[in-house]
């Protein structure tokens, strides 16, 4: 899913760079969700960054032992389509030598368990990826909560 940048002239530049390898981005609205569902029902593969802070909704689930706001989009899509969920990431190699791809075994229970358990399983998979290369994770997402309330000042 893709949200246009605030600087109008950057949109096409960013899209060209990101879609150059054959991927397709969909908007971060209901039409984008419908496009993702359609792709999954056709047996296509989609990619979602499950650690993004949801703009609305979401559920608190453990993440490194602390409650973290977790999107329910991945759980919902997997549950509606019985899609296999595979987690992976691209590790940047030193000296700009490229990337090493890492994939975890599928967790089939993400698509069949209640939302709370599914969210916890998603966060556990994200944790496994982070532990493989913690220095490469973008730690700025404001996912952590205190007693269900946001405590970030900005």
Question: Residue ranges of each PLM-predicted region?
Answer:
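Non-catalytic C-terminal accessory region of glycerolipid acyltransferases
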Residues: 30-154
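Conserved nucleotide-cofactor-binding alpha/beta core module
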Residues: 1-44
């Amino acid at each position: 899913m893709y949200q246009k940048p605030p600087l109008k002239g950057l949109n096409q530049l960013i899209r060209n760079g990101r879609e150059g390898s054959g991927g397709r981005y969909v908007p971060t609205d209901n039409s984008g969700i419908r496009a993702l569902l359609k792709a999954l029902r056709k047996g296509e593969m989609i990619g979602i960054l499950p650690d993004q802070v949801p703009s609305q909704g979401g559920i608190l689930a453990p993440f490194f032992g602390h409650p973290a706001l977790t999107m329910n989009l991945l759980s919902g899509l997997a549950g509606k389509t019985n899609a296999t969920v595979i987690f992976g990431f691209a590790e940047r190699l030193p000296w700009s030598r490229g990337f090493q791809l890492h994939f975890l075994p599928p967790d089939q229970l993400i698509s069949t368990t209640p939302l709370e358990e599914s969210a916890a399983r998603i966060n556990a998979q994200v944790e496994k990826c982070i532990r493989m290369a913690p220095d490469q994770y973008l730690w700025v997402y404001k996912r952590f909560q205190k007693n269900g309330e946001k405590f970030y000042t900005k």
